[in-house]
Regions:
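Non-catalytic substrate-recognition/targeting regions of SAM-dependent transferases
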Residues: 7, 11-67, 75
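C-terminal substrate-binding/active-site "lid" region of AdoMet-derived donor-dependent transferases
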Residues: 179-215, 219
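Single conserved hydrophobic/aromatic residue that forms the stacking wall/gate
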Residues: 2-13, 213-221
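Conserved class I S-adenosyl-L-methionine
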Residues: 83-89
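Conserved SAM-binding loop of SAM-dependent methyltransferases across substrates and taxa
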Residues: 93-105
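Mobile active-site "lid"/loop adjacent to the S-adenosyl-L-methionine
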Residues: 153-183
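Conserved SAM-binding motif I beta-strand of class I
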Residues: 107-112
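S-adenosyl-L-methionine
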Residues: 119-151
Length: 221
């Protein structure tokens, strides 16, 4: 917080700066996490990313309220979406869904266990594509949704929350990622595409790639 002020970032970011550390800083005795506006104060926020608009909840949203680190992957997905049926699991703000819609996907299904996330996704779809009927959203557990869905998709996005925030949870996390990806592969049509991610710090790139290869089915493509 003091660093933000001392570097004069208030002059760089013209509209507002929201400092959020209560749920993001690791616990240490000498740290005092707190949230609050350093500049501005509006909670009605719409951000623009590559020409698309997104409602963002800085205050109550997960972490920063919008995962900017995925913007290039969202843009990449848009290039593969044309004419495809797309399933966006753990959709949160619906970022991948919005890009798939602009990429002319045949249909887009968004799934998240949080009703608030589904509401936010629907708002972002309507903000960019008012009245478009290609999109449907479901507030449901990801594993249960994959179990009950008989249809297969051309493209699936898996962007779950962290399964392991520390090394002690690594084994269970790897099992969870493998189970999730196995189920996703079962719902992908032959020749389909899987966008799969891990934000678990304890899971290395090598661990993740290995479990993806193990999860991949042996059916011919």
């Amino acid at each position: 917080r003091d660093l933000v002020r001392s570097r004069g970032l208030g002059d760089v970011y013209k509209r507002q700066i929201y400092y959020k550390s209560e749920t993001t800083l690791p616990f240490k005795a000498d740290l005092y996490p707190e949230n609050g506006f350093l500049k501005g104060g509006s909670t009605d926020n719409v951000a623009m990313e590559y020409g698309l608009k997104f409602h963002i909840d800085w205050l109550k949203g997960q972490k920063t309220g919008f995962f900017v680190d995925q913007r290039e992957n969202r843009s990449l997905l848009e290039r593969y979406a044309k004419g495809r049926s797309v399933l966006n699991m753990f959709c949160y703000t619906g970022g991948f869904s919005v890009y798939a819609m602009r990429g002319d996907a045949k249909l887009v299904h968004s799934v998240d266990s949080s009703a608030k996330a589904i509401d936010l996704t629907n708002k972002n779809i309507e903000l960019n594509f008012p009245g478009d009927t290609r999109h449907a959203a479901y507030a449901e557990d990801a594993f249960k949704y994959l179990d009950r869905m008989g249809d297969q998709y051309d493209l699936i996005v898996l962007d779950p929350p962290a399964f392991a925030k520390h090394r002690d949870a690594l084994r269970n996390a790897l099992q969870g990622y493998r189970k999730l990806n196995v189920k996703a592969f079962e719902k992908i049509k032959p020749g389909g595409i899987l966008f799969t991610f891990s934000c678990s710090q304890a899971v290395s790139k090598e661990n993740f790639l290995s479990l993806i290869h193990i999860s991949e089915p042996t059916r011919p493509y």
